[in-house]
């Protein structure tokens, strides 16, 4: 019987079997093909056999006498072959562990085996992915026997195979099954022999059924597309699949062994069930078990450095193993407790599963349970969810209904029109019979409710943590000892922390003591850098000498190095920055221990730009990783986010002045980054519940307001935010002013022409390069006409391209190519080009055209007034080309200025800043919003002018706070230039709605200090005597 006939044999036998509910076996992978482990004695006996390097499964198939090896000679059947039908195909799988492992009972057969001329040998190499993942493979040598070094793993593999056979043949004794395992080399061979000897596997159906018992269900071992295979003409392909399934089975067992080393209290069968729930993804199962172990206070033995890994409580060492098994089954079983079943095309394992407990212990289970287990039976919805779904569909607003998966605005409108839903039957009938709706929305509604439950569980757990922090401070204060960490003595004695900075230092020490990570989110200008340095000094005094890592934007690296050397010269700082060759030398020094350092300072780009950079910070064991301008990690789906998550640090601290920017999901991304072991198992639910767009106050539903309240509850223990108006009473005020600028006559004509042309293109669904960024095209025209090409017509460009041939640098150039290059240039770029080349000098634009902008007319008047008052100006723009045109304006009006943008060398930036702060005759500092809006101190200026606003208002706030920060002595005026009747007015409105979200998140309850919990803030102040 070849493999194809064996499959048919299983299929036909299965159709004849009566249904037996007590047996629902299922191998863990398609096709139970697996290599067998041998004892040391068997391996030694193997060494005496000289044979061809052929798998035993093939030998068994081709041998004339295929009786079970344990059968006595006198009882063996003569000349009967069950594996004779397949024509001379031998399969050698180099990725299998059992290639060279043969039972002694088969050794004589091996010696006599030869290949005829019709034999085809198929050799399968292990894939690169298998080798790169470090999956166990046997060492391969010609005509030699591979050796298994770890005898304990041999026993574990044998136990695993025994467990698989027991599930298939529950009525057979362990001794019978062990004999079969020892007599064959693969799982396929053992199962085939067992089918011939015992007749059938367990006598029960393999079709999945809903368990009626109270015990948690045991997963079936055959999926629909695993149990029955279609007829194949190509037997070689079938052999490949059989060998591949054998390899997959062994990989799974190696993953089980690896996981058991991390969790010795768990049985292997329990770990298999968990891995099945997570589609055999080791990292996901590990994270889930870690969360479960932490919630149940169980033992977890870490074999590697894990972020936030803390010592396990001593009482967990004696945690009963049977209790572990019970708890684990309760956590990962679904079907016996959930009657929610629904038909699906295919059974898919979902890594996100959660059990709805009758009594919820706050914070005991944060994972999600959104996987519905499907069977072929009728749909059943448990009563608990019926009431929740009925109540939700009856009372939810249209906006809330659209949160249901696959529920559009139109469907939500129809649901509201079908109300009221007086009963479950009425709801089901109305949804089924209404055009455009279906009963699937009811099942999807359960998914939404479960997602809400996950968020509520996170809230409860976070509330517990917050209460613990409060209790800790209360206890210390009550005992009279107080919680007061003074300024570390190794800080520069000539400098002192401000009172609110001492509170920040104490808060950082408090969360560190409780094994948490945090986000220091003080408003820009309150000295987050100083508080972070003071915290590192505190750790140094406590005996934690590092190494620590500080990741910063490129524009602030010089400032960080200066501040660390100024505030805490005791800390030895290593700057990981420079070219690839320079960084290579630094890496060599680090690995060779030539460098003596406590802190490494690097940039976001240098930390992850190459595989060598990423490898360094994965291998280097860091104590704290501090990320400045942490809002750069607001997108959990970005490559930067994923790479930085791999940094091997015990603790993480984020510094950001704008934790909330566009939506609440960005804030949740930051929380997931600093506390991955707590939030990573719920990222999909968090993404759905907090990713909706920000709305104005009058458009917010009750649920959206609740969402904000939920987010505030979750972030409470992990974030500290103070605003300047509350902690810096002496800081001068900041005033905002909106200047609506009417466009010039020519500019307005050009803007309307562009608008109509783009609108026509949209209506005609035309695809062209101009439509790639309609918004950007309108923004550029609203700022200045020279950002487009209007004045240099095609005729002018052709004439200019001919004249360019007279230039020594272009005498042999092709005029057509010059013309093509000029076509894509803007008017101002062409104007600059005309200034560079003598023969086209006459084509320069007049100064009147350069200054022909509505914003320039207003800006000229504002600058004249400010100069007369003695004010100094910091002028920001989004576009570097706009800065080029602004330079022409400033020169025209004879204003002294400096300029800093993304092209400015990092080494030069600090000198430009110092020059502006010391030379009071410099009137204007030109900055690009991206490059000059982060970590720069320009308190010598008191007026900020935003020539063009950003789509993200927090980028503009960052720019404003270059002046409005500690050290400012004058009132700060912020002026925003908005072109009237353009897209900029819509941008301004949207930005105001985004800022409203931050106000909602940081709304101060009575007694609060910022968004920090009121009790903790007050207690810390009281304890410190402030």
UniProtKB/Swiss-Prot annotation:
Residues 1-82, 203-251, 302-328, 354-373 are annotated as: Disordered. CDD domains: DEXHc_SMARCAD1, SF2_C_SNF. This is SWI/SNF-related matrix-associated actin-dependent regulator of chromatin subfamily A containing DEAD/H box 1. A motif (DEGH box) lies at residues 628-631. DNA helicase that possesses intrinsic ATP-dependent nucleosome-remodeling activity and is both required for DNA repair and heterochromatin organization. Promotes DNA end resection of double-strand breaks (DSBs) following DNA damage: probably acts by weakening histone DNA interactions in nucleosomes flanking DSBs. Required for the restoration of heterochromatin organization after replication. Acts at replication sites to facilitate the maintenance of heterochromatin by directing H3 and H4 histones deacetylation, H3 'Lys-9' trimethylation (H3K9me3) and restoration of silencing. It is linked to Adermatoglyphia: An autosomal dominant condition characterized by the lack of epidermal ridges on the palms and soles, which results in the absence of fingerprints, and is associated with a reduced number of sweat gland openings and reduced sweating of palms and soles. Basan syndrome: An autosomal dominant form of adermatoglyphia associated with congenital facial milia, acral blistering, digital contractures, and nail abnormalities. Adermatoglyphia is defined by the lack of epidermal ridges on the palms and soles, which results in the absence of fingerprints. The modification N-acetylmethionine is found at residue 1. GO terms for cellular component: chromatin; heterochromatin; nuclear replication fork; nucleoplasm; nucleus; site of double-strand break. A motif (Nuclear localization signal) lies at residues 721-738. The modification Phosphoserine is found at residues 57, 79, 124, 127, 132, 146, 152, 211, 214, 239, 242, 302. A motif (DEGD box) lies at residues 1005-1008. Residues 7-19, 226-238 have a biased composition (Basic and acidic residues). Residues 509-677 form the Helicase ATP-binding domain. Residues 157-199, 251-294 form the CUE domain. Keywords: Acetylation, ATP-binding, Chromatin regulator, Chromosome, DNA damage, DNA repair, DNA-binding, Ectodermal dysplasia, Helicase, Hydrolase, Isopeptide bond, Nucleotide-binding, Nucleus, Palmoplantar keratoderma, Phosphoprotein, Repeat, Ubl conjugation. There is a cross-link at residues 77, 84, 335, 471, 724, 996 (Glycyl lysine isopeptide (Lys-Gly) (interchain with G-Cter in SUMO2)). PROSITE patterns: CUE, HELICASE_ATP_BIND_1, HELICASE_CTER. The keyword DNA-binding applies. It comes from Homo sapiens. The modification Phosphotyrosine is found at residue 217. Residues 314-323 have a biased composition (Polar residues).
């Amino acid at each position: 019987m070849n493999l194809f006939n064996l499959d048919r044999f299983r299929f036909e036998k299965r159709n004849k079997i009566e249904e037996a509910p007590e047996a629902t076996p299922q191998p863990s992978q398609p096709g139970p093909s697996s290599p067998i482990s041998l004892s040391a004695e068997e391996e030694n006996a193997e060494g005496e056999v000289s044979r061809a390097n052929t798998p035993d499964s093939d030998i068994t198939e081709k041998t004339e006498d295929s009786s079970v090896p344990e059968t006595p000679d006198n009882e063996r059947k003569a000349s009967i072959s069950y594996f004779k039908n397949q024509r001379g195909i031998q399969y050698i799988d180099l990725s299998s562990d059992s290639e060279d492992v043969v039972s002694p009972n088969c050794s004589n057969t091996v010696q006599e085996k030869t290949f005829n001329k019709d034999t085809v040998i198929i050799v399968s190499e292990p894939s690169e992915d298998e080798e790169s993942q470090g999956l166990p493979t046997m060492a391969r040598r010609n005509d030699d026997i591979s050796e298994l070094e770890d005898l304990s793993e041999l026993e574990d593999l044998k136990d695993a195979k025994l467990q698989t056979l027991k599930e298939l043949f529950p009525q057979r004794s362990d001794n019978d099954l062990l004999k079969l395992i020892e007599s064959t080399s693969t799982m396929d061979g053992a199962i085939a022999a067992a089918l011939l000897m015992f007749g059938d596997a367990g006598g029960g159906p393999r079709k999945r059924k809903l368990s009626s018992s109270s015990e948690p269900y045991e997963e079936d071992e055959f999926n629909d597309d695993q149990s029955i295979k279609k007829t194949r003409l190509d037997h070689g392909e079938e052999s490949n699949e059989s060998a591949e399934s054998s390899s997959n089975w062994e990989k799974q067992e190696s993953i089980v062994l690896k996981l058991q080393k991390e969790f010795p209290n768990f049985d292997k069968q329990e770990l298999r069930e968990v891995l099945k729930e997570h589609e055999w993804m080791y990292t996901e199962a590990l994270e889930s078990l870690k969360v479960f172990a932490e919630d149940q206070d169980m033992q977890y033995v870490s074999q590697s450095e894990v972020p936030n890994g803390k010592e396990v409580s001593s009482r967990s060492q004696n945690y009963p193993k049977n209790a572990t098994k019970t708890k684990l089954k309760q956590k990962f079983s679904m079907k016996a407790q959930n009657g929610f079943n629904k038909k699906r095309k295919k059974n898919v394992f979902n890594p996100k599963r959660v059990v709805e407990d009758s009594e919820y212990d706050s914070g005991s289970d944060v994972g999600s349970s959104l996987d519905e287990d499907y069977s072929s039976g009728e749909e059943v919805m448990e009563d608990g969810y019926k009431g929740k779904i009925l109540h939700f569909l009856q009372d939810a607003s249209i906006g809330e209904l659209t949160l249901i998966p696959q529920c559009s605005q139109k469907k939500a409108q129809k649901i509201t029109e079908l109300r009221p839903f007086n009963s479950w039957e009425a709801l089901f009938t109305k949804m089924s019979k209404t055009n455009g709706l279906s009963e699937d929305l009811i099942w999807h509604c359960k998914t939404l409710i479960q997602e809400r439950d996950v968020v509520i569980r996170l809230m409860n757990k976070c509330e517990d943590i917050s209460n613990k922090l409060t209790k800790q401070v209360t206890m210390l204060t009550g005992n009279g000892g107080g919680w007061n960490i003074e300024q570390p003595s190794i800080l520069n004695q000539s400098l002192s922390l401000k009172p609110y900075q001492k509170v920040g230092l104490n808060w950082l020490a408090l969360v560190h003591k409780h094994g948490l990570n945090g986000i220091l989110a003080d408003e820009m200008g309150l000295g987050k850098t100083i508080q972070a340095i003071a915290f590192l000094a505190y750790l140094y005094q406590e005996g934690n000498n590092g190494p620590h890592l500080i990741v910063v934007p490129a524009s602030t690296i010089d400032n960080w190095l200066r501040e660390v050397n100024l505030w805490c010269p005791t800390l030895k700082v290593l700057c990981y920055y420079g070219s690839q060759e320079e960084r290579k030398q630094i890496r060599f020094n680090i690995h060779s221990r030539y460098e003596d350092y406590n802190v490494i300072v690097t940039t976001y780009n240098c930390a992850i730009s190459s595989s060598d950079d990423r490898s360094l910070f994965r291998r280097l064991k860091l104590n704290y990783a501090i990320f400045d301008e942490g809002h750069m990690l607001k997108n959990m789906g970005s490559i930067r986010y994923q790479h930085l998550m791999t940094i091997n640090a015990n603790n993480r601290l984020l510094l950001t002045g704008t934790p909330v920017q566009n939506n609440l999901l960005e804030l949740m991304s930051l929380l997931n980054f600093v506390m991955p072991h707590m939030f990573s198992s719920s990222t999909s639910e968090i993404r759905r519940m907090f990713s909706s767009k920000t709305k104005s106050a009058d458009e917010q539903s009750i649920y959206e307001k609740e969402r904000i309240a939920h987010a505030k509850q979750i972030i409470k223990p992990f974030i500290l935010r103070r605003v300047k108006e509350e902690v810096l009473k002496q800081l001068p005020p900041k005033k905002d002013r909106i200047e609506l600028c009417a466009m010039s006559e020519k500019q307005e004509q050009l803007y309307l022409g562009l608008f109509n042309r783009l609108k026509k293109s949209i209506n005609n669904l035309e695809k062209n390069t101009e439509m790639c960024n309609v918004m950007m095209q309108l923004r550029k025209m609203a700022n200045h006409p020279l950002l487009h090409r209007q004045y240099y017509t095609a005729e002018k460009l052709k004439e200019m391209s001919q004249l360019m041939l007279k230039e020594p640098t272009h005498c042999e150039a092709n005029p057509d190519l010059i013309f093509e290059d000029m076509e894509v240039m803007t008017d101002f770029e062409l104007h600059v080009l005309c200034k560079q080349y003598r023969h086209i000098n006459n084509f320069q634009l007049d100064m009147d055209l350069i200054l022909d902008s509505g914003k320039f007319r207003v800006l000229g008047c504002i600058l004249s007034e400010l100069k007369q008052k003695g004010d100094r100006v910091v002028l920001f723009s989004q576009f570097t080309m706009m800065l080029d045109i602004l330079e022409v304006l400033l020169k025209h009006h004879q204003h002294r200025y400096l300029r800093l943008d993304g092209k400015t060398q990092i080494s030069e930036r600090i000198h430009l800043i110092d020059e502006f702060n010391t030379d009071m005759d410099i009137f204007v500092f030109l900055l690009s919003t991206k490059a000059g809006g982060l970590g720069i101190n320009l308190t010598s200026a008191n007026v900020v002018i935003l020539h063009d606003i950003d789509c993200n208002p927090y980028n503009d706030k960052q720019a404003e706070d270059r002046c409005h920060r500690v050290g400012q002595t004058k009132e700060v005026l912020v002026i925003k230039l908005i072109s009237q009747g353009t897209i900029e007015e819509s941008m301004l409105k949207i930005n105001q709605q985004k800022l409203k979200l931050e106000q909602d998140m940081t709304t101060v309850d009575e007694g609060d200090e910022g968004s920090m919990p009121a009790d903790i803030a007050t207690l810390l102040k009281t304890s410190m005597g402030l």
